UniProtKB/Swiss-Prot annotation:
Pathway: Cofactor biosynthesis; NAD(+) biosynthesis [regulation]; Cofactor biosynthesis; NAD(+) biosynthesis; NAD(+) from nicotinamide D-ribonucleotide: step 1/1
Reaction(s) catalysed (UniProt annotation): beta-nicotinamide D-ribonucleotide + ATP + H(+) = diphosphate + NAD(+); beta-nicotinamide D-riboside + ATP = beta-nicotinamide D-ribonucleotide + ADP + H(+)
Record-linked InterPro entries: Cro/C1-type_HTH, Cyt_trans-like, Lambda_DNA-bd_dom_sf, NAD_biosynth-regulator, NAD_NadR, NadR/Ttd14_AAA_dom, NadR_NMN_Atrans, NMNAT_NadR
GO MF annotation terms: ATP binding; DNA binding; nicotinamide-nucleotide adenylyltransferase activity; ribosylnicotinamide kinase activity
UniProt activity-regulation remark: Feed-back regulated by NAD. A high level of NAD causes NadR to lose enzymatic activity and repress several NAD synthetic genes; conversely, a low NAD level activates the assimilatory enzymatic activities and leads to derepression of biosynthetic genes.
Positions contributing to NAD(+) 1 binding: 70-73, 77, 104, 144-157, 177-179, 204-206
Keywords, in A-Z order: ATP-binding, Cell membrane, Cytoplasm, DNA-binding, Kinase, Membrane, Multifunctional enzyme, NAD, Nucleotide-binding, Pyridine nucleotide biosynthesis, Repressor, Transcription, Transcription regulation, Transferase
Consequence of changing residue 80 to A: Complete loss of NMN adenylyltransferase activity
Protein name, entry field: Trifunctional NAD biosynthesis/regulator protein NadR
DNA-binding region, residues: 18-37
Gene that specifies this protein: nadR
GO BP, one annotated term: NAD biosynthetic process
PANTHER family in alphabetical order: NADR_TTD14 AAA DOMAIN-CONTAINING PROTEIN, TRIFUNCTIONAL NAD BIOSYNTHESIS/REGULATOR PROTEIN NADR
Length: 410
């Protein structure tokens, strides 16, 4: 017998033809015939519900299996991802509830080796981006402000989380965690069974505390969507023919990472026919925007550190030099893009004419160098002045500066 024989009986009792039933239920007659004879392995729930509704029958709904994962995700790491992937393959719907507390989170940052503090939006974005193709995963943010940390805050926290889940309509069948000590607490305070995933950390031996303490040491455990947050940026500045581009390339090679080339040179070739004589004030915002995109790309794919050929202060300095005024859009990017290490190269290497340079005299080079220093100070940008005149000495000095910035983490 077919599991849908009761539908055949209902159709006969109502005296309807298959075509009439199919039309009313939003399906073809052929699909309905195969459905009634159990020829379709995974019938559409929507079509089945429409068919039951037309025949006046109650649609037999299967109880969903709901899972929930709690965490700070500060930061998200591959151990979290393993837990979540295991959980979401065992349930129909998985809810990830990210807890945040401004005071606690600030303390975690201050006790860490992280160069910047992740915001709540940063942490949500990591989760949303990482699991965006898995439609049975839902992401939530839960404010834990004022709740004592474990193990003292279970009563207050559990009351808060129960109210939160009730508001969101979340009725978990199971809680998934890797923390063995939390399982009895979840059962006692929430009345929900816990499924432990890799509690011994045999597959993913990592914790958020380890990454906060030394991100670069545990780089392999930081997910693709999270790595750009931890990337350190090094901007190499200097006047024309100061060796910036060559040095950036050499540094990226030696640190096995990415670099952002000077977009202004590409812009001159692609928009001005390779000659700066047509450059005007309205070009500087486009140059700055293009350079920002180069930087973002380099940071996204970097291996711990990204090297930047020329910063926005330099772009602004050229605008001021040639146009007699600063550009507000370029200034906005100066304010937005703050690099971890800014190296200003002394303009004391041989000047090389390449068709895109016009400040070749010693007087012009010195004046532009002074302008760069002045504007860096005006924008409260700390920098290291590298004065070595020979290329090898300059290279070695910059390598040491980068290693110093990376610290023991490098």
């Amino acid at each position: 017998m077919s599991s849908f024989d009761y539908l055949k009986t209902a159709i006969k009792q109502q005296g309807c033809t298959l075509q009439q039933v199919a039309d009313a239920s939003g399906m073809t007659k052929g699909y309905l015939s195969q459905l009634l004879n159990a020829k379709i392995k995974s019938p559409s729930a929507q079509k089945l519900e429409a068919l039951h509704r037309f025949l006046g029958l109650e649609f037999p709904r299967r109880q969903k299996n709901i899972g929930v994962v709690f965490g700070k995700f500060y930061p998200l790491h591959t151990g979290h991802i393993y837990l979540i992937q295991r959980a979401c393959s065992q349930v129909d719907e998985l809810h990830i509830i990210m807890g945040y507390d401004d005071t606690r989170d600030r303390g975690l940052f201050e006790d860490s080796a992280m160069s910047q503090q992740p915001t709540v939006s940063d942490r949500l974005r990591w989760l949303l981006q990482t699991f965006k193709y898995q439609k049975n995963i839902r992401i939530h943010a839960f404010n834990e402000e004022g709740m004592e940390p474990y193990p003292h805050g279970w009563d207050v926290w559990s009351n808060g989380i129960k109210a939160f889940m009730a508001e969101k309509g979340i009725q978990p069948s199971w809680i998934y965690t890797s923390e063995e000590a939390d399982a009895p607490q979840y059962l006692e305070h929430l009345g929900i069974e816990t499924v432990l995933v890799d509690p011994e950390r045999t597959f993913m031996n990592i914790s958020g505390a380890q990454i906060r303490e030394n991100p670069f040491r545990y780089w392999e455990y930081i997910p693709t969507e999270v790595k750009p947050f931890f990337v350190r940026t090094v901007a190499i500045l200097g006047g024309e023919s100061s060796g910036k581009s060559t040095l950036v390339n050499k540094l990226a090679n030696i640190f096995n990472t990415t670099s952002a080339w000077e977009y202004g040179r590409d812009y001159v070739f692609s928009h001005l026919g390779g000659d700066e004589m047509a450059l005007q004030y309205s070009d500087y915002d486009k140059i700055a925007l293009g350079h920002a995109q180069y930087i973002d790309f380099a940071v996204k794919y970097a291996n711990k550190v990204a090297f930047i050929d020329t910063d926005f202060v330099t772009t602004q300095a050229f605008c001021k030099k040639y146009e007699g005024r600063e550009h507000p859009f370029v200034q906005a990017l100066i304010d937005e893009y703050r690099f971890d290490l800014v190296i200003l190269l002394e303009n004391n290497t041989p000047w090389v004419a390449d068709g895109l340079r016009s400040l070749g005299s010693s007087v012009d080079r010195k004046a532009f160098q002074n302008l760069l220093v002045e504007m860096l100070k005006e924008n409260n940008i700390e920098f290291v002045h590298v004065k070595e005149a020979d290329y090898d000495g300059r290279f070695l000095r910059c390598v040491e500066l980068v290693k110093e910035m990376m610290g023991e983490q490098g």
